[in-house]
Amino acid sequence: MARAFPLERVRNIGIAAHIDAGKTTTTERILFYSGVVHKIGEVHDGAAVTDWMAQERERGITITAAAISTSWQEHRINIIDTPGHVDFTIEVERSMRVLDGVIAVFCAVGGVQPQSETVWRQADRYSVPRMVFVNKMDRTGADFLKVYDQIKDRLKANAAPIQLPIGAEGDLSGIIDLVSNKAHIYKNDLGTDIEETEIPSDMAEKAAEWRSKLMETVAETDEELIESFLENGELTIDQLKKGIREGVLKHGLVPMLCGSAFKNKGVQLVLDAVIDYLPAPIDVPPIQGVLPSGKDDVRPSEDNAPFSALAFKVMADPYGKLTFVRMYSGVLEKGSYVLNSTKDAKERISRLVVLKADDREEVDQLRAGDLGAVLGLKNTTTGDTLCSTDDPIVLETLFVPEPVISVAVEPKTKGDMEKLSKALVSLAEEDPTFRVSTDQETNQTVIAGMGELHLEILVDRMLREFKVEANIGAPQVSYRETIRSSSKGEGKYARQTGGKGQYGHVVIEMEPGEPGSGFEFINKIVGGVVPKEYIGPASNGMKETCESGVLAGYPLIDVKVTMVDGSFHDVDSSEMAFKIAGSMAFKDGVKKCNPVLLEPMMKVEVEVPEDFLGSIIGDLSSRRGQVEGQSIDDGISKVQSKVPLAEMFGYATQLRSMTQGRGIFSMEFSKYEEVPRNVAEAIISKNQGNS
C-alpha cells in the first residue's frame, strides 16, 4: 500500500499550555477549518471533539492527550491536545516524547503562568521545536507585546513576532502578517471570509518597525542571511520563511502568532505556520536506542528501515485495550508479530487504527512518522519499545515523575473487591504516575498520584467506567528517605535447620547517589569470593529493602551501593540466603549513613489583589513556605513561593476565605527536600506508633 502523504508532508504536533489558555478551543477550530468536523464544538458547552471522557466534558478541562489526524494544504497533521492542569503533567510529558513540534498557546491576558514554564521545560527536555500562539486577543486586558516580553524574560526564549493584531479586546478585526507584509481582515463571525489587503495606514509604521526587527532576528540565525541583509537592507519573503524555519529547527527561534480561537480569528494562519515552520519527521534527528549488545544505535525516519515504535499511552476502551504508538521507522502491518524489546515479549498486532478523538478509522498499516493505535497487545505498557523481531532495539523511554500524594481506598461493599482490583490494574496500566500498593501494616490498598484532582478523577472513573463505589481515606504525603554520608554495611545470614543449612555473607560500601538516581548497584567482587549467581539475589534483596526505609518506612531513594566482599559455603549457600544477607547488609549500612526524611516541595504561585498581599505572605510563612519572588501588575500581586505539600491541604478554601474569593493559586511539584528535624521527629514517632 502506497504512502498517503510523503514524509516531508507530515507534521506531528502538540498543542500545549497552562490551564485555560484555550488549547482545546484552538484544536477544535483547527479541526473545523481543516474539515474534520463540520460544526464548532465549545469546551464550555461540553462539546469539544478532543475532550471525549465524561469528566473532561463536565469539567471543561482536558485530562488525557487526545490524538487526532487531519490534513491542510496537502499535508497530514497529527495533533495531540494535552492537558494544562499540573496533576496531568505525565500526559504532557508522554506527548512531548513523541512529537516533532509544538504550538505553545498563551493567554493574551494571563501571559506566562507557572504551568507554561513546566510545559516549556518538558519541551526543552525532549528538544522539541516550537512556535507560540497568543490566544484570547479579544479579551479585556489582552496585550500581545506584554506576552512577548514575558516569554523572553521568564522562558529565556528568542521569541520573534511574525504577526501583529489589528485592534484588541472587542475591536480585534484582523491580523498583520509581517512575513508577507499584508493584513488579513475578517469579514464574518465564522472566520471563513478573510480579505487580504494592504496594512492599514494607522498601523503601517508599527508594522514596518516590527518587520525590520523580525528580519534582523532571522538574519542572525544564518551567515548567508546576515550577508544578504547587510547588503540589501532587507530579506525577501522566501528568505524570511527559510530563515524562520531553519531557526525553529535549530531551536534558535520561536515565532509568535496571535488571534482568538473562540472568535475564529487567526487559526488558519496558525495551520499555515505549522506547515511552513514546524519540522517533518525527516527534519528531526533520528531516534536513538540501544542494541541487545549494549551498543548505541539510531533508527532513521524511513519506511524501508527496520520497524521501531514507542508505546506512549495505553487506554482501556470499549473495543479492548488501545495502545497508542509513535512510528519511528519501518512499516507495521495488521496481523503481524512484533517484539516488545523492553520486556523481551512477542506481541501480535490484531488491528490498527488512526484516531479522530472518539471516532476511529481502521487501517492495514502504519508507516514511519505516523501516530496511531494498536489493538491486541497483551504485555505492552507506556514507554515500551516495539520493534522488528529480526532487528531488536530499545528506544529511549519516557521520564515519569514520582507521585506526591497518596490515599487509602476500599470498596463500599465486600463484593466489589475484585472489581476494584481490576479497575486499579487497568487505570495503572494507562497512567504511569498512578501507583497502587498494599500497606503491609494495615493491609489497606493505597493509591498514589500527582495531586488531589488527579486522584479525584481516577476515583470518579472507577465509578463511571468500572461501576465500583469506593471509600477514600484522607490524603497522605508521599515522603521519601535518603542518606547523607558514607559507610560500610555487613550482613551475614547463617541458619542450621536439620541436615541442610543456609549461608550468605555480604559486605557493601554505601554512599549518597546523584539526585534522581534511585537505587544504584555496582559489583566489585573479585577472585570469586562470592560466585556470580549470588550477586543478583544480593542486589535484589537490597533493592526490595529500599521500598521501606529505616526511619519511618518510606521508600529510600538516591543510594549508591558497591558490593566489595563477602563469603559463601559450597553446600549451604543459596540465592535466598544471599537475598536475605543483602537486605541485612543494606539495613546495617543505612543506619550508619545519617538517614534523613525528605518531603515533596511544591512551587506555589498566588495571585491576589494588592490589599491582601501581607496576609497571603504571612500565611505562606506559617506553612513553612519560602517566598522566592513577587510582582505587582495593575493592582494584582503575584507571589512565587516554595511550600511543603504537607502544609498545602485545604489551601484553596483558606485562600478563598482570606481574599473574599478573589485570590487564585497554582501548585506544581518542584523537588524533594530534607524535612526540618522537629517536623521529621513528629512524623517518625507517629509512624512508629502506628507500626
UniProtKB/Swiss-Prot annotation:
Keyword Coiled coil included in the entry's annotation: no
Keywords of this entry: Cytoplasm, Elongation factor, GTP-binding, Nucleotide-binding, Protein biosynthesis
GO CC terms of this entry: cytoplasm
Segments forming domain tr-type G: 8-282
Record-linked InterPro entries: EFG_II, EFG_III, EFG_III/V, EFG_IV, EFG_V, EFG_V-like, EFTu-like_2, G_TR_CS
Name this polypeptide is given: Elongation factor G
Protein task: Catalyzes the GTP-dependent ribosomal translocation step during translation elongation. During this step, the ribosome changes from the pre-translocational (PRE) to the post-translocational (POST) state as the newly formed A-site-bound peptidyl-tRNA and P-site-bound deacylated tRNA move to the P and E sites, respectively. Catalyzes the coordinated movement of the two tRNA molecules, the mRNA and conformational changes in the ribosome.
Domain of life: Bacteria
Record's subcellular location: Cytoplasm
GO molecular function: GTP binding; GTPase activity; translation elongation factor activity
Family label: Belongs to the TRAFAC class translation factor GTPase superfamily. Classic translation factor GTPase family. EF-G/EF-2 subfamily.
Positions contributing to GTP binding: 17-24, 81-85, 135-138
SMART domains reported in the protein's UniProt record: EFG_C, EFG_IV
Alphabetized CDD domains for the sequence: EF-G (cd01886), EFG_III (cd16262), EFG_mtEFG1_IV (cd01434), EFG_mtEFG_C (cd03713), EFG_mtEFG_II (cd04088)
